[in-house]
C-alpha cells in the first residue's frame, strides 16, 4: 500500500473521534488538509508548492511520538481556498508526515471562532482587501471512507499512468539489441550497391603504415570480434585500402582506440550518392514550439545495412598481421554511406514527419501537445521502427524529456537552446598555442560550427586574423597576439548566451549593421508577439492600418532615397508596439561576416544595404514565411527597403540587391546608432567607426 495511504489510514483508525479532513486548494491544485488542533504550526509536503525557502536557522519541533525533528525549509504567505473563499496562512513548514497538509492552531486562531460540529467545521473568513468584511464559512468534514476512497482513486490514477508509461519501456525493449545484425529484429532486407566509375579499375593502395605491437594485437582482437558477428569476412578482392588506429580526445575518454580505413582512392573511383542530409536550421524550424522530446539512436547504424555481393569486394582493407578482409555491411569511410543511410531512415519514417525526424542514425521525436500525446507519438514511432527492422541502442535512448541534447545542442521545451557541454569541451581542449595550419583549421572548424548556430556574437573579425595563417603563401609564425586571440575566443565560448528558438506565434525583430570591412545581424523574438501587437499568423495587421506605398523615381541618389525613409503607418504602429515590449524580447541568434576586398570599396551607404541582404538571406528559413521588423541605423537602407530603384545600367548591383530583398516583407524602423547595440558592436568592436 502507498505510504501516503498508510499514514492516512493510521490517522483515521488510531481511535481519535475528532479526526478531521477537509478539501482545500492551493493555486490550481486540490489537497486533503488534516485539521490538527494539537499542532501549534502548519506543515506541508514538498509537492504543495514550488517556492520553498531555506530558513536562516533550523526550527526544532516535537511531534506526537515525542521525537525531535529539525525543519529547514518553509513558505510564507500561502493563499489557501476553502469553499472558494481565500484564506492566508502566514507560514507553512516543510515536513513530510505522510499527509499533504496539516493545518495547526496558528491558522485556526487567525480565523476564530473555529467551531467543529459533527459533520462540518466553521471558520470566520475575512476579506483580505477589506478586513472589516467577514462571514462564517462552513465546510464539510470528510468521512473515513471518503478520505480513503479519494486516496485510493489517486493511487489508481498513478498506477494507470505507471502502466501506461511502462508499455513504452516494453515496446523499446522489442527493438533493442547489442548486435546490429540480430536476425530476430533486423529485417530491413536491403542490399546496398556501390559501383565503380570504371568497372575494370583496381583500387589497391599499398599499405606502408608502420604498425606497433599494440596495433597488431588490437587489430587481431577487433577483427576476430567483427568476424564472429558476421560484419566482415576474409577477402580475395583485388581492391585494398589500409587500416589504422586513431586516438583522439573522444577515444581517450572512452578508453578505446578507433579503427579507421583510408578509402580515399576508392571514393575517388566510385559513383557518389547525392541524397542530402537535413540542414540544422531545417531541424530547428521543424521542432519549434515542441514541449516534449525523445531521442533514439540506431545501434551501429551503418552496420544494419547489408551489402550486395558485388559491392563487398570494393570495401576490402588490409591490416596486420598480413590480413585482408572485406565488409558484409555498410562501412564507415565510404563517401556514399551518410546519404545511403539517410535515405533509408527517411523512407522508413515516411509519413511520420510531423512527429519525428532523423539525422543519419539519430532519431528525434517531438510533440507540441501534452505528455500523454508525446507518449502516444513515441509508441507510433517505435511500432514503425519495429516494422522496418531498425535496431535501437537502449543505452543511448532518452524517452519523454522536456530537455534533450541533439546534434551538439541542448534543446528545451520552452524554446531555449544552449550549446551542449560536450561541444564546448571539444573546443576548450585545444591548446592556446596552436601547433600548425591543420590544427588552426580544426579549431576554426569547431568555432564555425558554433557561429553557424548563432551563438557567437563577433566571430567574423576574430576568425579573419587566424584564417590568414592557414595560407601556405604566408610564412608560418605564431606569436603572443595569436595566443591571446585563441584565449579570447575560448573565454567567450565559456560564457555563450542561451538562444531562443522562436515559434510561429512569435514576432521577429532583425537588426543589421555594417562597417567598411564587416557586416552583422541580430535576430530577436517577442514571445507570442503577433497576438500582443495585433497581427495574424503571417505578421499582417488584423486592424485596418494605412499602408505606405513606394513608386519608381528618376533620381536614385542617396539624398532622394533618404527622403523615402519616412515610415508607413503600419511600420510606425508595429515599431511603437515593440518599443513598449522591449524588455520581453529574447535573443534568437547572431550572424557576422567580412566583406570581400571588392565589396570594401563600395560606399558605406551601399555596404549597409549589402549587410541587410546578407543577414536576411542567412535567416531566410525564419523570415520568408512571415512579416518581421527590420531595424537599421542607416537612412539609406531604410529608404532602399521602401524605394524602387529605376532600371539603369549604372545601378546594376543596387537593382540586383533589391530583387533579392523583394522576397521579404519587413516593417522598417530607422533607429539611432546608440539604439542598435546588438548588431553595431559586432561590426565596430574591431574596426574604426564609419558614418553612414
Curated annotation (Swiss-Prot):
It comes from the Viruses. Residues 227-411 form the Reverse transcriptase domain. InterPro entries: DNA/RNA_pol_sf, Pept_A3A, Peptidase_aspartic_dom_sf, Rev_trsase/Diguanyl_cyclase, RT_dom, RT_RNaseH, Viral_Replic_Matur_Polypro. GO terms for molecular function: aspartic-type endopeptidase activity; endonuclease activity; RNA-directed DNA polymerase activity. Keywords: Aspartyl protease, Endonuclease, Hydrolase, Nuclease, Nucleotidyltransferase, Protease, RNA-directed DNA polymerase, Transferase. One of its GO terms (biological process) is proteolysis. It catalyses: DNA(n) + a 2'-deoxyribonucleoside 5'-triphosphate = DNA(n+1) + diphosphate. Its EC number is 3.4.23.-, 2.7.7.49. Gene3D superfamilies: 3.30.70.270, Acid Proteases, HIV Type 1 Reverse Transcriptase, subunit A, domain 1. The active site is at 36 (for protease activity). It holds the Pfam family RVT_1. The polymerase/reverse transcriptase (RT) and ribonuclease H (RH) domains are structured in five subdomains: finger, palm, thumb, connection and RNase H. Within the palm subdomain, the 'primer grip' region is thought to be involved in the positioning of the primer terminus for accommodating the incoming nucleotide. The RH domain stabilizes the association of RT with primer-template. Belongs to the caulimoviridae enzymatic polyprotein family. Encodes for at least two polypeptides: protease (PR) and reverse transcriptase (RT). The protease processes the polyprotein in cis. Reverse transcriptase is multifunctional enzyme that converts the viral RNA genome into dsDNA in viral cytoplasmic capsids. This enzyme displays a DNA polymerase activity that can copy either DNA or RNA templates, and a ribonuclease H (RNase H) activity that cleaves the RNA strand of RNA-DNA heteroduplexes in a partially processive 3'- to 5'-endonucleasic mode. This is Enzymatic polyprotein.
Amino acid at each position: 500500500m502507498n505510504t501516503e495511504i498508510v499514514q492516512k489510514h493510521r490517522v483515521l483508525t488510531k481511535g481519535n473521534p475528532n479526526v478531521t479532513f477537509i478539501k482545500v486548494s492551493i493555486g490550481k491544485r486540490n489537497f486533503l488538509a488534516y485539521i490538527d488542533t494539537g499542532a501549534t504550526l502548519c506543515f506541508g509536503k514538498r509537492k504543495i508548492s514550488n517556492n520553498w525557502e531555506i530558513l536562516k536557522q533550523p526550527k526544532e519541533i516535537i511531534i506526537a511520538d515525542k521525537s525531535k525533528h529539525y525543519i529547514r525549509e518553509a513558505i510564507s504567505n500561502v493563499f489557501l481556498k476553502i469553499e472558494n473563499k481565500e484564506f492566508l496562512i502566514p507560514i507553512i513548514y516543510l515536513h513530510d508526515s505522510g499527509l499533504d497538509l496539516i493545518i495547526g492552531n496558528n491558522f485556526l486562531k487567525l480565523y476564530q471562532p473555529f467551531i467543529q460540529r459533527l459533520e462540518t467545521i466553521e471558520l470566520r473568513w475575512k476579506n483580505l482587501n477589506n478586513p472589516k468584511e467577514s462571514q462564517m464559512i462552513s465546510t464539510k468534514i470528510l468521512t473515513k471512507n471518503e478520505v480513503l476512497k479519494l486516496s485510493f482513486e489517486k493511487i489508481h490514477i498513478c498506477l494507470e499512468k505507471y502502466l501506461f508509461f511502462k508499455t513504452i519501456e516494453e515496446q523499446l525493449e522489442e527493438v533493442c539489441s547489442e548486435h546490429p545484425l540480430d536476425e530476430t529484429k533486423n529485417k530491413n532486407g536491403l542490399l546496398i550497391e556501390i559501383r565503380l566509375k570504371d568497372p575494370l579499375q583496381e583500387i589497391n593502395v599499398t599499405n606502408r603504415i608502420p604498425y606497433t605491437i599494440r596495433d597488431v594485437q588490437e587489430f587481431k582482437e577487433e577483427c576476430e570480434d567483427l568476424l564472429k558477428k558476421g560484419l566482415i569476412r576474409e577477402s580475395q578482392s583485388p581492391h585494398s585500402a589500409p587500416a589504422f588506429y586513431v586516438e583522439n580526445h573522444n577515444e581517450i575518454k572512452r578508453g578505446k582506440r578507433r579503427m579507421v580505413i583510408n578509402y580515399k582512392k576508392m571514393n575517388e573511383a566510385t559513383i557518389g550518392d547525392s541524397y542530402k542530409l537535413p540542414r540544422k536550421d531545417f531541424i530547428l524550424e521543424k521542432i519549434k514550439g515542441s514541449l516534449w522530446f525523445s531521442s533514439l539512436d540506431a545501434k551501429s547504424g551503418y552496420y544494419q545495412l547489408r551489402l550486395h555481393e558485388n559491392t563487398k569486394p570494393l570495401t576490402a582493407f588490409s591490416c596486420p598481421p598480413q590480413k585482408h578482409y572485406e565488409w558484409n555491411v555498410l562501412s564507415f569511410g565510404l563517401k556514399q554511406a551518410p546519404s545511403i543511410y539517410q535515405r533509408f531512415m527517411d523512407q522508413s519514417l515516411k509519413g511520420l514527419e510531423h512527429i519525428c525526424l532523423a539525422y543519419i542514425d539519430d532519431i528525434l521525436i517531438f510533440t507540441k501537445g501534452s505528455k500523454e500525446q508525446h507518449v502516444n507519438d513515441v509508441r507510433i514511432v517505435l511500432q514503425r521502427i519495429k516494422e522496418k527492422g531498425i535496431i535501437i541502442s537502449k543505452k543511448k535512448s532518452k524517452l519523454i524529456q522536456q530537455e534533450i541534447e541533439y546534434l551538439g545542442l541542448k534543446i528545451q521545451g520552452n524554446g531555449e537552446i544552449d550549446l551542449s557541454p560536450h561541444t564546448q569541451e571539444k573546443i576548450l581542449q585545444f591548446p592556446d598555442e596552436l601547433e600548425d595550419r591543420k590544427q588552426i583549421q580544426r579549431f576554426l572548424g569547431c568555432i564555425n560550427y558554433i557561429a553557424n548556430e548563432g551563438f557567437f556574437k563577433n566571430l567574423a573579425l576574430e576568425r579573419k586574423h587566424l584564417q590568414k595563417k592557414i595560407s601556405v603563401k604566408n610564412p608560418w609564425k605564431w606569436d603572443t597576439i595569436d595566443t591571446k586571440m585563441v584565449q579570447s575566443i575560448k573565454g567567450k565560448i565559456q560564457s555563450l548566451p542561451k538562444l531562443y528558438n522562436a515559434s510561429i506565434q512569435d514576432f521577429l525583430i532583425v537588426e543589421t549593421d555594417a562597417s567598411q570591412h564587416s557586416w552583422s545581424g541580430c535576430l530577436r523574438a517577442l514571445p507570442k508577439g503577433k497576438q500582443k501587437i495585433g497581427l495574424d499568423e503571417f505578421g499582417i495587421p488584423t486592424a485596418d492600418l494605412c499602408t505606405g506605398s513606394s513608386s519608381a523615381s528618376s533620381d536614385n541618389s542617396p539624398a532622394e532615397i533618404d527622403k523615402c525613409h519616412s515610415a508607413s503607418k503600419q511600420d510606425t504602429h508595429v515599431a511603437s508596439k515593440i518599443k513598449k515590449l522591449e524588455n520581453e524580447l529574447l535573443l534568437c541568434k547572431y550572424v557576422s561576416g567580412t566583406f570581400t576586398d571588392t565589396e570594401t570599396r563600395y560606399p558605406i551607404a551601399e555596404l549597409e544595404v549589402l549587410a541587410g541582404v546578407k543577414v536576411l538571406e542567412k535567416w531566410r528559413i525564419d523570415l520568408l514565411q512571415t512579416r518581421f521588423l527590420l531595424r537599421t541605423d542607416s537612412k539609406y537602407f531604410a529608404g532602399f527597403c521602401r524605394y524602387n530603384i529605376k532600371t539603369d545600367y549604372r545601378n546594376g548591383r543596387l537593382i540586383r540587391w533589391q530583387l533579392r530583398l523583394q522576397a521579404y516583407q519587413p516593417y522598417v524602423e530607422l533607429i539611432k546608432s546608440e539604439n542598435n547595440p546588438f548588431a553595431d558592436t559586432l561590426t565596430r568592436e574591431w574596426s574604426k567607426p564609419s558614418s553612414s
